[in-house]
Amino acid sequence: MSVLDLARAELRGIRPYVPGAYEPGMIRLNANESPWRSPGDTSDRGLNVYPPPRPTVLQVKLAEYYGIEQKQILVTRGSSEAIDVLIRGFCAAGKDKILICPPTFDMYRLYASIQNAGIVRVPLLAARDFALDVDDILKALDANTKIVFVCSPNNPTGQSMARPDIERICRETAGRALVVIDEAYHEYATGGHYLDLRNRYEHVVLLRTLSKFVSLAGVRCGLIVGAPQLIEFAQVVLPPYTFPTPSIELVEQALSQDSLRVSEERVATIKRERERLAAALRDVPQVMKVFPSDANFIMVKTRDGQAFRETARRAGILVRTFEDPLLADCVRITIGRPTDNDQLLRAVAGVERASNA
């Protein structure tokens, strides 16, 4: 069975859009573009011409960086667009479903709702630091469950999922559903990644992003990593020309050796600060528990989440609370610069001293 047998039947025969030919050095009179640059255009390639249908130069660089083949990569506008592309490609509206494990990244639910796809929820096991409930995940699958989303490290709880659990899900869903492993935070993890699974299981897809690691959240660059035939199919769903020229050039710069060296040093700093902040928060009376984290944030259980959030806000710091009952009084704290983290700790400690005076 091919992974494409899981895709929407009505999309399988559609051919991708074929753009006009582009040859460097040739005069472009075949694409109805302006022959002049816009005033203030300082880009290398020129913003008066369309970007390439696919940012091939980035696919080459990313494939080299991750040690995979170019045909296994599709660049998207952030990993959120990748989620949308996969749901639209595999879930027929009003018929098919996705499976998610809340509390988790809410974009899975949002894009499924927009597509009118069903949503099966198998909650993480809160008593086990939000581990996957693999038995219930497998029991919940039926013929219309087309995608299983697993976020590792998980947002917003922060922990990496146990590799044996993920491998079991991949093994037992073969031929039944696509497994999408969202690795948006994998650079901050200590337990490795799941790139090796793409060759062992045709139905396994990985999501990556450059928003965190190389500090390009404003550029919106994500990618789908999967079997070549799945990537070819996803290109039917993703329109051409979606990745802008300025974004291509910024990502190229970020993937240079010098820039990557800086990014890797910053990741090391975040990891050190994560441990320091976690240790300090354990001594704060408001904090009941600091959850283990493999991401660039920490989640804590507090006595009063709203009060903790307002304490931080009065000190000029924004932290995140959640409406999900599973996360009652939990607060997600992004790891900032050392001075940012110090400011948060001073604010929380100061309020505690005042309340205990």
Please name every model-derived segment:
Residues 203-283, 289-290:
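PLP-dependent aminotransferase class I/II
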Residues 164, 311-315, 320, 324-357:
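PLP-dependent enzyme catalytic core of the Aspartate aminotransferase-like
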Residues 1-64:
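N-terminal "arm"/small-domain region of PLP-dependent enzymes with the aminotransferase-like
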Residues 55-97, 115, 302:
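Phosphate-binding glycine-rich loop
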Residues 72, 89-150:
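PLP-dependent aminotransferase-like
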Residues 113, 131-144, 156-216:
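Active-site pre-lysine segment of PLP-dependent enzymes
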Residues 270-271, 281-315, 331:
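Conserved PLP-binding catalytic core of the aspartate aminotransferase-like
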